[in-house]
UniProtKB/Swiss-Prot annotation:
Pathway: Phospholipid metabolism; phosphatidylethanolamine biosynthesis; phosphatidylethanolamine from CDP-diacylglycerol: step 2/2. The record marks G255, S256 as: Cleavage (non-hydrolytic). Binds 1 pyruvoyl group covalently per subunit. Keywords: Cell membrane, Decarboxylase, Lipid biosynthesis, Lipid metabolism, Lyase, Membrane, Phospholipid biosynthesis, Phospholipid metabolism, Pyruvate, Zymogen. This is Phosphatidylserine decarboxylase proenzyme. Catalyzes the formation of phosphatidylethanolamine (PtdEtn) from phosphatidylserine (PtdSer). Its cofactor is pyruvate. The modification Pyruvic acid (Ser) is found at S256. Its EC number is 4.1.1.65.
Length: 296
C-alpha cells in the first residue's frame, strides 16, 4: 500500500498500482527475486515487452487501462481510436490547457506529472533513496566534479507510475547541454522495489544533462528508466534556448523517475511538500504546477 498526499484536496490517498500483485510477488518472494535477477531486470525482457507495446495488437488494452485507472482522456490530444499502439497511448501528448504553467519567473514548477519527495541540504555521498537506503551522487552520474556542485543543495525525486502522463518538461527558461547516457538494469522504481534493492537508481539505465536555467542556476536532470521502459526519448535540441514548460523528452511504457538536483540556496520548496517529505510521504503534482520559489 502506497499512501501519498494530494495537495489539492489536502487529503491522503492510496495509490492504485498497475500490476501490484506481480510487483509484490517479484520483490517479496524468493522465486520472484530469482526470476527478477536472472531475467526481468535485463534489457532483453524490457525489449521484448517494448516490441509488444509498439505493436498494433497492444492497442486493445488501452480502453481498459484508461478505465481501470481513471485516466482523464479529455486532456489527451488524441482519442482512443487514434492511437496506433499502447506505447502511442502511453506517451500521449496533452492539450496545453490541461497543464497550465505557473509562469512567474520566480516559481519553480514540476517538470512532470507524478509523486514527488524532496530532500534539502543533501550530502552528495549520502542521498536518500528511501528511509534506511542511500546512494552517492557520483555513483548515479559517474562524474565527480559535477557531483560536488550539488553538495548541500536540493534533491527532488519525481516518480511517474504507469498511469501518469509520461512526457517531461523544462522547469525554467534556459539552455540544456547534451545528454549523457549510462547503461544499466531495468528494476521497477515503485517504492516496493526501492525498499528492496540497494542503490537502485545507480543500477538502472539512466540519462543525465545539465540545464543552465535563467533563474535557478545549474540544474542536474537525471531520467531513470525502469522495468519495461524500452526507451528514454530526448526531444529537445542541446545547447539551444528553451522556454519554461517546453518538452524535454518522454518515457516509453513503464514506471519511471526523474531526479533533479539544484545548487545550495537556489530555491525554497513549498511548505506542504516539505512537510510531507519529512514524513517520508510523496506529494502528487502535475506538470507546470508550482513546487517552490526562487531564493533571492
Amino acid at each position: 500500500m502506497i499512501k501519498y498526499y494530494n495537495r489539492k484536496t489536502k487529503n491522503y490517498e492510496i495509490e492504485k498500482i498497475a500490476g501490484e500483485k506481480y510487483l509484490n510477488w517479484t520483490y517479496n518472494s524468493p522465486v520472484g527475486m530469482t526470476i527478477l535477477e536472472k531475467f526481468i531486470k535485463k534489457k532483453l525482457f524490457s525489449k521484448i515487452y517494448g516490441l509488444y507495446c509498439n505493436s498494433k495488437i497492444s492497442s486493445y488494452k488501452i480502453k481498459k487501462f484508461a478505465t481501470d485507472f481513471n485516466i482523464n482522456m479529455s486532456h489527451s490530444e488524441k482519442s482512443f481510436n487514434d492511437f496506433k499502439s499502447f506505447n502511442d497511448f502511453f506517451s500521449r501528448k496533452l492539450i496545453k490547457s490541461s497543464r497550465p504553467i505557473a509562469d512567474n519567473k520566480n516559481f519553480l514548477i514540476s517538470p512532470c506529472d507524478g509523486k514527488i519527495i524532496v530532500y534539502n541540504n543533501i550530502n552528495m555521498n549520502n542521498i536518500i533513496q528511501v528511509k534506511g537506503i542511500t546512494y552517492k551522487l557520483n555513483d548515479l552520474i559517474q562524474n565527480d566534479s559535477i557531483s560536488k556542485t550539488y553538495e548541500k543543495g536540493t534533491c527532488i525525486i519525481a516518480r511517474l507510475c504507469p498511469t501518469d502522463y509520461h512526457r517531461f518538461h523544462f522547469l525554467d527558461n534556459g539552455i540544456c547541454e547534451s545528454t549523457i547516457k549510462i547503461k544499466g538494469n531495468y528494476y521497477s522504481v515503485n517504492p516496493i522495489a526501492l525498499n528492496k534493492i540497494n542503490n537502485l537508481f545507480c543500477q538502472n539505465k539512466r540519462e543525465w544533462s545539465i540545464f543552465n536555467s535563467d533563474n535557478f542556476g545549474k540544474i542536474l536532470y537525471v531520467e531513470i528508466g525502469a522495468t519495461c521502459v524500452g526507451s528514454i526519448i530526448q526531444t529537445y535540441m542541446p545547447n539551444k534556448k528553451v522556454l519554461k514548460g517546453m518538452e524535454k523528452g518522454y518515457f516509453k511504457f513503464g514506471g519511471s523517475t526523474i531526479v533533479l538536483f539544484l545548487e545550495h540556496n537556489k530555491v525554497i520548496i513549498d511548505e506542504d511538500i516539505l512537510t510531507e517529505s519529512k514524513l517520508g510521504i510523496e506529494t502528487k503534482v502535475l506538470m507546470g504546477e508550482r513546487i517552490g520559489t526562487k531564493l533571492n
